[in-house]
């Protein structure tokens, strides 16, 4: 009987420890800090997207997108770039820089994540991501 009681206490302690440590950093609220290209390699703070649903929507689009692992050379600096930041200043994480180029027809966007992940987005995903990040609309 004593062994059974001790095993129940041990299991209860393990469950408390596991649930206490399961606050994954990915569940923390984040915001998107956007900068716009204004001059040769110079960017200016443009927008801060703080709505958690919009941030999650952008993260979902990026996570569902298949990036190519290749180094690309663009003919001009990115039109915009953005990073995800935690709203809680005590959380430190390495930020990935996402750079956005708008196509000449303004119907698709090209994104480079970090140094070597490239994708071209068009259609609904491009329009949604661009609208949330910049507050502007792509031509549909």
Over which residues does each language-model region extend?
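Short structural boundary motif marking the start of a folded domain
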Residues: 26-33, 78-80
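Acidic/histidine-rich, surface-exposed loop or edge segments in extracytoplasmic proteins
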Residues: 35-44, 112-114
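Bacterial N-terminal signal peptides that target proteins for export
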Residues: 1-8
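Short, structured surface segments that line ligand/substrate-binding pockets
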Residues: 68-108
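C-terminal partner/receptor-binding element of secreted or periplasmic proteins
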Residues: 114-140
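Bacterial signal peptide processing site
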Residues: 22-24
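C-terminal motif of bacterial Sec signal peptides marking the signal peptidase cleavage site
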Residues: 17-20
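Post-signal-peptide N-terminal segment of Sec-exported extracytoplasmic proteins
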Residues: 39-74
């Amino acid at each position: 009987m004593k062994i059974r009681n001790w095993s129940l206490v041990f299991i209860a302690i393990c469950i408390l420890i596991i649930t206490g440590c399961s606050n994954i950093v990915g569940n923390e609220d984040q915001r998107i800090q956007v900068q716009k290209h204004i001059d040769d390699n110079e960017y200016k703070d443009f927008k801060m997207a703080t709505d958690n649903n919009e941030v999650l929507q952008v993260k979902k689009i990026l996570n569902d997108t298949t990036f190519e692992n290749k180094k690309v050379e663009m003919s001009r600096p990115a039109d915009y770039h953005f990073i995800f930041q935690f709203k809680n200043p005590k959380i430190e994480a390495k930020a990935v820089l996402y750079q956005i180029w708008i196509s000449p027809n303004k119907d698709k966007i090209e994104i480079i994540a970090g140094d070597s992940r490239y994708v071209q987005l068009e259609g609904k995903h491009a329009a949604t991501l661009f609208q949330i990040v910049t507050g502007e609309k792509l031509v549909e």
